[in-house]
Design a protein with these regions (language model features):
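C-terminal cap of metal-dependent C-N hydrolases
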Residues: 11, 327, 338, 346-348, ...
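Glycine-enriched alpha-helix->loop->beta-strand junction motifs that scaffold or abut catalytic
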Residues: 208-215, 234-238, 302-303
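Divalent-metal coordination cores built from histidine and acidic residues
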Residues: 71-193, 228-266
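Histidine/acidic-residue-rich catalytic or RNA/ligand-binding cores of hydrolases
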Residues: 72, 204-211, 245-265, 291, ...
């Protein structure tokens, strides 16, 4: 792990909150040393020309399912942190260790195993065999022990799956309201956030009554109501809409335009390009239109919206780690966020909501996770894919494709 010193000079800076048209950013020993109007460099310090470019904080994907080699794929597209929302601890332990030691991988936080019931989501999507590999919550008495076990595994937050399947054309059991509330309370007792997987408006209402801190999907079975928007605002929750995955589930949107984009295609293995170009096609009664409208209205009301993709493994179609984040930003803009607001949803907002105080902004003393792009994504969001440089803890990434097209098959749910 090297520790270089350099400056990025005469660059437009989006610092996670606002745009500064002309700055110089000084990085030393993996941290941002200074953000100034001018900098008198010496011959010993590398100077990166930022003219015509925009410097962003490294992107934070607020909903993934991390598995080797997803952290490498994520970083290739400027995602410097993934927030995993359901993974087996055996896989996560190694990924945490590698991310702590290496700067060619994105960092990761995890919910470990999500709380669901026997036969509940995601069993209808991944099959009985995979679903049976995970512990479930069988009764109210299990709630405290389930949360304690996840905390012992290293969970950074606790996830509840409140989903009866109706938005996806299924009918499956789900957590009861008393059990969900007990899980959320137990998470808070351990000093952890509780986040809720929902796909229906009724599920969202139940999650809010249970006391979750955030919803990690937007409901899409029906249009939003004034009541649900008021409840979300009153509860102070954030919402990660995962519009990329909602589009795939509702068979409306896939990642074909990303797979075929000349800025991305050379860096995406063939198996992942194929994955991007498909939808789940579940024939669900839900609609991406409902989710986009709900995102728009929640955002207008003042609910914090975070950017997340729900990217998982091969077989979880419609998304891919890293590159799908750029498509998600486009969808957030389609849902009514300005480009600057969409960029906040991928940087400072998730950092604040998930307690990542060392990242998500460009400011002195913070970690030098940086994304340099050609053009101005604060005006045209698609410019985020015109990548000119990526730094992880101050080390510049060499953007080359992975050595192999070998990828993990589906072993974790898209939830």
């Amino acid at each position: 792990m090297t520790r270089t010193e350099f400056v990025i000079r005469d660059v437009r800076v989006f610092d996670g909150e606002k745009v500064v048209e002309r700055s110089t950013v000084h990085v030393r020993s993996g941290l941002i040393e200074a953000v100034t109007a001018e900098f008198d460099s010496t011959d010993e310090i590398e100077v990166v020309d930022g003219r015509g470019k925009t410097l962003l904080p490294g992107l934070i994907d607020s909903h993934t399912h991390a598995q080797p080699p997803s952290l490498k794929d994520a970083l290739l597209f400027g995602v410097t942190t993934e927030l995993d929302m359901f993974s087996c601890p055996e896989w996560m332990d190694g990924q945490r260790r590698d991310a702590a030691e290496r700067n060619d991988l994105a960092d990761v936080r995890s919910a470990s195993i999500g709380a669901t019931v026997l036969g509940g989501h995601p069993s209808m999507m991944i099959g009985t065999y995979f679903a049976e590999q995970y512990p479930v919550v069988k009764s109210l008495d299990d709630a405290s022990a389930f949360v304690a076990a996840r905390v012992a595994e290293g969970a950074d937050y606790i996830k509840l799956l409140i989903d009866d399947g109706t938005a996806l054309g299924h009918d499956v059991p789900t957590l009861g309201e008393d059990v969900a509330r007990a899980i959320a309370n137990a998470a808070h007792d351990h000093g952890k956030m509780a986040v809720g997987h929902v796909t229906s408006l009724a599920g969202a209402e139940q999650a809010l009554r249970a006391g979750v801190d955030g919803l990690v999907h937007m409901f899409f079975d029906r249009p939003p109501t004034d009541e649900i928007i008021a409840k979300a605002l009153d509860a102070g929750v954030f919402i990660t809409p995962t519009l990329s995955t909602v589009g795939s589930l509702a068979s409306d949107i896939d990642g074909t335009h990303l797979a075929n984009d000349d800025r991305a295609r050379p860096l995406i293995p063939a198996s992942w390009r194929e994955n991007l170009c498909q939808c789940w096609q579940l024939g669900s009664p839900g609609s991406i239109g409902h989710a986009i409208e709900a995102t728009r209205r929640m955002h207008e009301a003042g609910v914090d919206i975070l950017a997340g993709t729900d990217a998982a493994g091969i077989g979880v179609v419609g998304t891919a780690h890293g590159v799908s984040m750029h498509g998600e930003l486009e969808l957030l803009v389609r849902a009514g966020l300005s480009p600057v607001q969409a960029l906040r949803a991928a940087t400072s907002l998730p950092a604040r909501r998930f307690g990542l105080s060392d990242r998500g902004r460009i400011a002195p003393g913070l970690q030098a996770d940086l994304l340099l792009v050609e053009g101005d994504p604060t005006e045209e969001i698609t410019a985020t894919l015109s990548i000119a440089g990526i730094w992880r803890r101050g080390d510049k990434l060499s953007r080359v494709p992975r050595d192999s097209d070998r990828s993990s098959k589906i072993g974790q749910p898209a939830v």
